C-alpha cells in the first residue's frame, strides 16, 4: 500500500480542506480527496476501513456514509453489494441489462451499444441476479470461446417484483417454479402465504419477491394470488400477462378520467376543423375488428388521384401527461391475444369516441394527398377535421366485390381505390421494397374456449390496398416532420449487420442462391433475392432466413430510413388508438400546424427505447400464448399422422412445420432411421453415414404426433415418410395419410413402427411407392445406434 495512505494525517492532507471548512461547520474529507485515495488504492475498500484511514469519528460516520452514497448516485464512486467502495473512473464499468438463459448462464447487454458486444455471465455470476436486472459489470477477460466475460459488481435495479409460476412442495419446503424459464432458480415461498391461500400442487400462482437471491441464498416470495389450474381456459393469457409484466389494469385515475370523456362530438370540438361529413370515407378492416383507426377515400383528379386518409384524432381526447396518457405511455401498445385484447386506451375511447364507427360524427386528423399516375406523391397537407364514416367494410367483402365484379353502393369509390392501389404497388416494386408473403393462421374456438380448428388466413388485395394507403400517409408524416424540423419518433429499420450479412451469404451459397450488393446490399438487392425464392419448396423458410439477417425495426428520434420498405424516411401515423408512437406523431404534427413545439415528459430517446421494448414485449407475450394453445390443441392429436416440411435442422434432429395449421415440432435424430445421422451445418442438412440419405430444409415429410407437453411447450413427432436423399427420393407413403384421411388416429404395431423407422435407409422403408409407382422392396433392418446429445 502507498505510504501516503498509511499516514495518520491523511485527512489533513486533503488539498480541498480549506474549502470544506468554509462550507461546513464540521467538514468531511472532500469528494476529490476521497476519489484520489481510492484511485491510489486501485482496489475496492470497505467503508469502515476507509473511514478509519480518514480518521472519521463515530459521530461523523453516518454523514461520511451519506457523502459516499451521494457520490455513488452521481457516478463518482461505486459501492458494490459487499459494501466496498471504488473509484468509478478506475474501473472500466459498463451498465448492462441481464438476459438469462434457461440453462443457468446469461449475458450482460450494455444499455449503450458497444462495438465489442455483450458480456457472457457464467452460473457463478448469475446466482445473485435475475433476468432483466440492470447491473454494473466489469470486463473480466476472454473465455475459451473468444467471448468477453463479465463480473457483476452491483445491481442497479431489479426487474422482477412479481413472478408467476407453479406451486410445488419439495421435501417440506414450498417452492414457486417460475413459468419464465429464464428465471432458472426456484423461489422459496413464505409459509404464512401458503397457509392462507392453500394452493394445490401444480397450480399457477403469483408470488411477490420479498428477498432477492444472493450467491448462496435463494429468493423468497409470498403468495399474492392463485390463478388456478394450468389447463384452465384462458390460463395461458393470464400467465403471459404476468410473465411479461404487461400492464392489464387501468389505474383509478385513468378510469376516472376516461369516464369524463364525452361519448359524442360536441359543437365546441369542431372549432378549427374541416367538415368532411359529406365525403364518402369508408373503413375497411377484418371481420372481428372493434376499433377503427383509419378511413379512406380516393377520386380521380385529371391524370392524378386524390387520396384522403383520415385517422382517429386520439390526441384531442388524450392530453399530454394526463392520467389516460400516463397509462397509455406505460402500455405503449395494445396487445392482441386470441379471444382477448389488452387495449392501450380505455374501451370507451378505443371502441367508442375515438373509433371511426359508421354513421356517427368523429374527430380525425387527415392526410390529404395528390398521387400522380406514376405513383409519386405530388403534394400533401395535414389538417384536423370532423368526418362521418359512410360504411364499415371488411377485407373479404371488398375483395369479393373486386374479384367478382359485383355491384355495390360503394363500387365507384372501391374501383378507384383499387386502381390507385395498383399504381402504388407498381411504384413499391420499382422502389425495391422487400415483399414477404407470410402465411398466418387463425384459431377457431368452441363455446368452452378450446380450439376447434386452426385455419390459414390468406391476405388478399383488399388487405394490400389499405396497407398501401397507410404507407403513403406514414411517409408524408415523416416528411412533414423533417421539413418542419420537429423532433418525433421515426420508425427506423436498418439493413443487415456485417456479421448477419456474412451468415446469410454463407447460407445462400450452400443453396445455390446469391445476394447482390457486395458489402452494402440495397433493398432492391433483397427484393431481387426474394424473386429467386418463388416456386421453391423452401421459399417460406428462405424468407425467414432473409428476415433474420435484417435488424429489428425500432422507434428513434432521428431518421435512419426503413430498409424493408425502401423509404428514406418513415414514421407511424395511422394507428394512434393502439400505438403510442403514432399518438406522439399526431401531437408533433398538430404542434407544427399551430406553430408550437411538442415535448414529451421523458426524453425522445428514452421514449423511443420504451416504446420499442413494449412492442417486443407484446410480440413475445403473443407468441407464448399462441405456442401454448397450439401445444394444447395437439394433445388430442397424439397418434395421428400429418404432412409437412422440414423448417429447421440441428445436431439433435429436424424441425417440421405441419401443412395448413403451421404447427412446429421436433423429430429427434434417433427417430430418423436405422443409421448414424450427422448434422452437416456447411450444407444445412442431416445426413446418414451409411445410407447417404439427407434431410434438407424444405423437404416434404409425413410424421406421427408422439408427444405434446404443455409443461415445456414442446411437440415431438416421429418420422413416417418423406422425401430427400442424395441417391433418390422416397414418395410419401400411401399409409402416411394426413389427419382426417382413412385410418386417422390409428396406432401402428411395433413391427410397423420398426418398418417405418427403416424408411430412410438407402431410400427404402415404409411400404413406400417408389418414383416408378412400384412397391418398394422390403427393407433390411439395421440397428439404431443412438447418439448422445440434448434436444
Summary of predicted features, one role per range:
Residues 1-191, 674, 681-684:
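Charged, low-complexity terminal tails
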Residues 158, 162-791:
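Conserved, carboxylate-rich catalytic/transport cores that coordinate ions
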